[in-house]
Amino acid sequence: MYRAKRAALSPKVKRRVGKYELGRTIGEGTFAKVRFAKNTENDEPVAIKILDKEKVQKHRLVEQIRREICTMKLVKHPNVVRLFEVMGSKARIFIVLEYVTGGELFEIIATNGRLKEEEARKYFQQLINAVDYCHSRGVYHRDLKLENLLLDASGNLKVSDFGLSALTEQVKADGLLHTTCGTPNYVAPEVIEDRGYDGAAADIWSCGVILYVLLAGFLPFEDDNIIALYKKISEAQFTCPSWFSTGAKKLITRILDPNPTTRITISQILEDPWFKKGYKPPVFDEKYETSFDDVDAAFGDSEDRHVKEETEDQPTSMNAFELISLNQALNLDNLFEAKKEYKRETRFTSQCPPKEIITKIEEAAKPLGFDIQKKNYKMRMENLKAGRKGNLNVATEVFQVAPSLHVVELKKAKGDTLEFQKFYRTLSTQLKDVVWKCDGEVEGNGAAA
């Protein structure tokens, strides 16, 4: 039971990209995966969007993504998720982004329902601030939806995925953008009809849908039949609930205009009476220096400028059941095995790092005439000189009990048990600086196995 349970365990793997240690996956799409990461230099959390170079090249999006990343490096607005840097390896592009801790605005609506008008207006004002800033720099979102609106620890809005529209958009010969819709409920009529569209007008429509959801708690356009849904969007078939104020109704109606040429613009939204109530323009420092060297390196072919991807295996963890089983007095294996006068295996604990433990064992075993084979935190030691029962072969593995406590197990895999005991006594003498507590003394009487 004990051995079978351990066999099912597998080593933990730490993956590093440059100075970042990657953690769990927090998002995934067709072209990219987003993983939580930690900057090992300052312990700051970040989110890293990982793109597959082969997929990007296959869809001929390299230059567009490169251009949009360069533009996004210039965007430093308090209501937009920040792009810190870009790295590249032979196979991947890594976009390092600000990690926002407050969750999605979508979750708040899904859990608690609609917002009060004052709160909805505050978030809408912050959304328009972000959209206006990015549009003024030629950056469009084109996939604005509640799920892309995050909140920081202070409850301020942060728009994610701004400027990375190339992952879902393509420019055709007419010079206009074309797309296949990911979330049709938020998408403007001209986008659904794929007739080519202006990115700014499409973003404004999506902002109108978002404002409606914040105030109503549900979408303005919904239908189980996708064709019927498209018809409702194309004709702007929606009604405002009775609790909407007159000012909110007027603004939403002007935003959800199916004709992009007559739809309200951001400059007009900023002058709208309902919008202006309690409005405070954002104040932030735009003085900064931006380098694009990292972008050139990420997309370049020079391997000297590529970031290193490193995989670091961690020792297998032991659970509470296994720790109890290690205690000789409670070792459940003894219930099923004949009494052993001679030990074929032994263990010790160590407070040293696992790599140091493996290195010290190797340094102690080699002078004793042992050939060493290592893989991760497992080691096979074989005596090159044959003994009474052939070559002594010892299997060793390091297990993690806690971050700073490890159990080292040595088992006789082949050869004479007496020779194994003698080897361990000599080895443990050499490992005084590594061994914290031993698994009892090796017994020296009885018949050898």
Curated annotation (Swiss-Prot):
Lineage: Eukaryota, Viridiplantae, Streptophyta, Embryophyta, Tracheophyta
Location of the NAF domain: 313-337
Cofactor(s) listed: Mn(2+)
Subunit and partners: May interact with CBL3.
Protein's organism: Oryza sativa subsp. japonica (Rice)
Tissues where the protein occurs: Highly expressed in leaf blade and leaf sheath, but not in other tissues.
Active site: 143 (proton acceptor)
Name of the protein in its database record: CBL-interacting protein kinase 31
SUPFAM superfamilies linked: KA1-like, Protein kinase-like (PK-like)
Binding site for ATP: 26-34, 49
GO biological process: signal transduction
Region (Activation loop): 161-190
Induction summary: By salt, cold, calcium, sucrose and cytokinins in young seedlings, and by light in the shoot of etiolated seedlings. Induction by cold inhibited by the calcium ionophore A23187. Induction by calcium inhibited by the Ca(2+)-channel blocker La(3+), and by A23187.
GO molecular function annotation: ATP binding; protein serine kinase activity; protein serine/threonine kinase activity
PTM (free text): Autophosphorylated.
Disulphide-bonded residues: none
Reactions performed catalytically: L-seryl-[protein] + ATP = O-phospho-L-seryl-[protein] + ADP + H(+); L-threonyl-[protein] + ATP = O-phospho-L-threonyl-[protein] + ADP + H(+)
Annotated ranges, domain Protein kinase: 20-275
